[in-house]
Amino acid sequence: DVCSSDLSAFGDKARRLNLDIHIETSASDKASIDEAVAIALKTGASSVRFYPRYEGNLRDVLSIIANDIAYVRETYQDSGLTFTIEQHEDLKSHELVSLVKESEMESLSLLFDFANMINANEHPIDALKTMAPHITQVHIKDALIVKEEGGLGHKACISGQGDMPFKALLTHLICLGDDEPQVTAYGLEEEVDYYAPAFRFEDEDDNPWIPYRQMSETPLPENHLLDARLRKEKEDAINQINHVRNVLQQIKQEANHLLNH
């Protein structure tokens, strides 16, 4: 466990470097939210991201999540923190939008992940269009779409080598907002070899079963391969930064061309 003084020192260091801190937790229950908020307040973070992991029929799962969000609103809406719920493989875009709207919580918005809608049997641009009015944060990654029986899985890969419409997604997201950018944070997630199966299917009824799942993780290799894998993780992360910069430069050049012609 990290003590309060260590968390405070971490926050102080981030501020000296002119960095913001976002806390992320892979659940939405009371205990997980309380722990994440406590860390956020001790570090001086600005935002807490969460996503639900419940098993049950869709309507029951949505009801549980709505209760979780109500707890966040009633307990922490005056904390000074903002909150994001991430679309994370099991819920469809319109279901997430409904949760945010019905919460009537001004400090709650959506975190858009480049690939997580695939497992809910949606495609990136369609999901983005549905979620767009409520997106304030983004996880950038690339992935290969894996066709499964009646649904879709995704296997994360090196950015630029997958099926995600990388440039189109970035362009849409950058353009959100009128007088100022709507998206305030982009997280780069290079999760090479992470795999997530299909959770929603073409032939499902209007109240499908949502299976329980563990929090997302990429399996580690055997011990003798671990050092090489960790070196590759660092290389992959640097490559992703360079890829995103190159795509942003392309977008900038095209925008300048349109403005000047």
Predicted feature locations:
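Short, small-residue-biased leader/transition segments that mark boundaries at the very start
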Residues: V2-S4
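Active-site acidic/histidine proton-transfer and metal-coordination neighborhood
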Residues: A9-S109, N119
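Membrane-targeting and insertion segments and their boundary/processing signals
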Residues: L7-F10, A66-A70, A143, K147, ...
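Histidine-acidic metal/acid-base catalytic patches
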Residues: S93-S107, I118-H261
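Active-site glycine-centered loops adjacent to acidic/histidine catalytic or metal-binding residues
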Residues: D113
